[in-house]
Amino acid sequence: MADRERGVCCVPVRRLREGKVAQLSEVLKALADPTRLEMVTILKDATEPVCVCDFVATFGLSQPTVSHHMARLREAGLVESEKRGIWAFCRLRRDLPAVTRRLIEALG
């Protein structure tokens, strides 16, 4: 039976592993928000951890809103933070998967 008759008319495709699909899906959902996308770009270019207070000033958002965005980025495995006094300082995770790092680097 010809491939076309079996419903296969193209070159076979290679699918991503299920775990990788779930991981990339979470990353892409987190980056789908314009504010979070810009926050990740800022963190990518930063030479040291960035204080949440700097995001509050830069975006004109409340501290709880910025913290919500950072929590979403943390849940997606993109950022880590440390508490210093009353503020949290954030940076991109150093152990990002290669595909995630390449995606972030491609942001410009």
Protein language model regions, located:
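Short amphipathic alpha-helical/adjacent loop interface patches that line ligand
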Residues: 59, 70, 100
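Alpha-helical residues within the helix-turn-helix
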Residues: 57, 74-75
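Short, charged, intrinsically disordered terminal tails
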Residues: 101-108
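N-terminal helix-turn-helix DNA-binding core of bacterial DNA-binding proteins
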Residues: 18, 22-62, 84, 88-95
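Short, charged/polar, Gly/Pro-enriched secondary-structure boundary elements
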Residues: 95-101
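N-terminal leader segment of winged-helix/HTH proteins
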Residues: 1-31, 76-78, 104
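Base-recognition residues in the alpha-helical recognition helix of bacterial helix-turn-helix
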Residues: 67-71, 86
